[in-house]
């Protein structure tokens, strides 16, 4: 996902556009400042905080995640009111120091864009179709390789001897 996909002006070789996936889909920008990954999809390198044996992008693409927002230069999960309030064991609302009920806050789920049920079950390819926001960002060969990988189950460890024992 971090493959350089800069588009250069043929006359002066200046960068006119950059379709590198991680330039938009990562949690930091080119100046290493925090940014909200485009589409809530972080394709950055490195281990996943959810499963250190997996790369971050693998988890982001194939597993549900929480919607995030940028607050004071930090990425935090978006929390919304569930409509319920904190209660004691007898069902009475627990009040805060000011006498207000305390709402129960929950995260906002973001569905995975890929599915191990195959390429056709994945929303991932929609943005690469004709007229899509990412049309021509990946080559037909790259898209075919991803589709075939999903069609065989999107395995992380293809060699059973490399898979962790747990």
Show which residues each predicted segment covers.
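Aromatic- and Gly/Pro-enriched helix-to-coil junctions and flexible linker segments
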Residues: 1-166
């Amino acid at each position: 996902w971090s493959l350089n996909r800069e588009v250069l002006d043929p006359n002066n070789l200046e960068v006119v556009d950059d379709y590198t996936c991680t330039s938009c889909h990562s949690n930091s920008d080119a100046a290493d400042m925090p940014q909200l990954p485009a589409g809530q999809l972080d394709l950055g390198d490195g281990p996943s905080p959810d499963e250190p044996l997996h790369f971050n992008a693998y988890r982001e693409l194939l597993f549900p995640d929480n919607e995030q927002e940028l607050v004071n230069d930090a990425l935090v999960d978006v929390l919304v009111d569930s409509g319920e309030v904190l209660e004691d064991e007898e069902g009475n609302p627990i009040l805060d120091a000011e006498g207000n009920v305390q709402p129960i806050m929950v995260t906002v789920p973001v569905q995975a864009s890929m599915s191990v049920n195959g390429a056709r079950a994945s929303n991932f390819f929609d943005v690469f179709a004709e007229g899509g926001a990412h049309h021509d960002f990946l080559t037909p060969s790259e898209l075919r390789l991803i589709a075939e990988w999903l069609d065989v189950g999107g395995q992380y460890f293809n060699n059973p001897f490399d898979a962790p024992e747990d």
